[in-house]
Amino acid sequence: ALEQRCIDPRFTYVKRGCAPYVEWLGIQENPSGAGWAAGKGYGNKILDILSNILETGEREEDMNIIKMLAKKNCYPGQNKPAYVVIHETDNWSRGADAKAHATAMKNGNLAGTVHYYVDSGSIYQTLDHKDGAWAVGDGGGRYGITNRNSINIEICVNPESDYYKAVDKAEQLAASLLKQYGWGTDRLKRHYDASRKHCPRRIQDEGLWPEFKRKTAAYMGTAPEKPT
């Protein structure tokens, strides 16, 4: 019997009929015989994927979410999510994309923090959902949405990013989060709803919020709640 079945190069999958299902995890063709053999990192990859599913309820590759989790400028372990809140960065500098903001946040260089940054090409997760962001505290909890009961998504507006594609990715992400928690679009809010701040600015200025909620509901496969 093989002692390390997950990494032994002699372990083939063809006999078990499951090669098509494990190939994408890093399986390599077995040079010493017919079939497929697990590479060295196979076991760890399985554990990483299972860990992510347990933590977020989503396979990361489905949303192409890149994790760059910060532990600064937040409320560790104090968030009990009840809302998904949409923001915009208001940062029009070239290069101010999702990765740049995520890096700055991880390094502790941003006073305001969120759980996700989205641009037209990528999504970065920057806080665990159980950690509260410094995102809507300016509302002082007057409207029921706080830093300790919300998941916050920031849409990047840098000029080289396609803004409307970024908005679409944010709609998909919001839909995924709402489905994960079993919520309807009545739990989808703007920063404005939490504090009356004019944010997300461009969505507000262009009157896009009803469409944002409609498309989010469509991605969820449901009808939108009453617009707010």
What are these regions (language model features)?
Residues 25-71, 76-78, 148, 156-228:
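Basic/polar, cationic surfaces and motifs that engage anionic cell-wall
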Residues 10-33:
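Surface-exposed intrinsically disordered loops and tails
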Residues 1-16, 164-178:
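Alpha-helical segment that forms one wall of the substrate-binding/catalytic cleft
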Residues 61-184:
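Active-site-adjacent loop/helix surface patches within enzyme catalytic domains
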